[in-house]
Each structure stands twice: as C-alpha cells, then as structure tokens.
Amino acid sequence: MRAFLKILMVLIFMSVAYAKNPSTLSKEEEVLQHLQSFSAHFKQVLKSEKPLVYYGVLKAKAPNWALWVYEKPLKKEIYMNDKEVVIYEPNLFQATITPLKDKTDFFTILKRLKKQDDGSFKTTINKTTYRLIFKDGKPFSLEFKDEMNNLVTITFSQAEINPTIADEIFVFKPKDENIDIVRQ
C-alpha cells in the first residue's frame, strides 16, 4: 500500500509540475498550430541567372484556400483550393485551371513544418524542401527550390495572423467575359 501511495504522490507531483509549464511549444509553433488565416504583402525573388522580383498580396485561409495577387511587374491572380489552381492573367485575357495533384497549398506546407535547431522550420513535400523563418512572432520568409532548381524566396511584410477573410475572395470570378478559360 505504501508503494502505491508513493507512486501516486510522484504522479501528482509530476502533474502539478507539468501544469505550471503546460506548453512545451515555442511561440512560433503555437502560431503555426493555431493559424486559421493569414494575410500579408509579399516580395518574391526567383534567383536564377537573371533574378526576377515580384510584389503582391497573399490571403490564405484554412483548410487550404489561398489567393496570391501579383501586382508588379505584371498583374496576375492565383486562386488555390484543395482541388485546383486557377491562374488568371488579365493582360493575356486568360485563366488557366489546373487540377491540384499534390497537396502543396499554403496551409498544407505550414501544417507540415517542423522546427529545426537553427530556429527555422522545414518540411519536404514531393521532393521540394520548404524553409520558413519567423520574425517578431510572425512568418517572415519562405524559401524553396522550384522545378528548375532556382531558389525562390518569399518575404512577407505587414503580416496579419488570423484576420477575418471572406470565403468569396478565394473563388475565381472572371472580371471580363472575353477571357479564354483553359483547362489542363
């Protein structure tokens, strides 16, 4: 009986000690775990022989919606959900709709990230390694190599964690009836 009481006392002590430190997750891991929506301005740099730089706004919402609005140097809108990707290029009067074969939407990437010793977060999906860096408790930089082995770095600014975002913005609605819709 005494052995049982000693074990019980140890278990109670451990539960009290754990209650004082309920979270073993870092601030960044907490953000990733509870992230339901994200909004930010972005700068995307494609490092190749001649670097390309794009600017725009990202809005994303769980479980797997994202809208990338490229503003410079060319206008482009990319709508993503769990089934397809729509790339709308207003200058070409064209929208291309492609089935999403691999789960590489924004939230799938974020949910699979694991903290590294250097403080960054990494995951590999379909032979592509993604690396996320936080700054001031918010996602700051996302890096990966594209299919041509070019390094892509997306830097976020004016980031908002869990803003209210209407579902309707993730649905592509042609703004011009004269656009070509290409299904791949």
From Swiss-Prot:
One of its GO terms (cellular component) is periplasmic space. GO terms for biological process: lipoprotein transport. Residues 1-19 form the signal peptide. Its main location: periplasm. InterPro entries: LolA/LolB/LppX, OM_lipoprot_carrier_LolA-like, OM_lipoprot_carrier_LolA_Pbac. SUPFAM superfamilies: Prokaryotic lipoproteins and lipoprotein localization factors. The keyword Metal-binding does not apply. Keywords: Chaperone, Periplasm, Protein transport, Signal, Transport. It is found in: Periplasm. The keyword Protein transport applies. Monomer. Participates in the translocation of lipoproteins from the inner membrane to the outer membrane. Only forms a complex with a lipoprotein if the residue after the N-terminal Cys is not an aspartate (The Asp acts as a targeting signal to indicate that the lipoprotein should stay in the inner membrane). Belongs to the LolA family. NCBIfam families: PRK00031.2-1. This is Outer-membrane lipoprotein carrier protein. The lineage of its organism: Bacteria, Pseudomonadati, Campylobacterota, Epsilonproteobacteria, Campylobacterales.
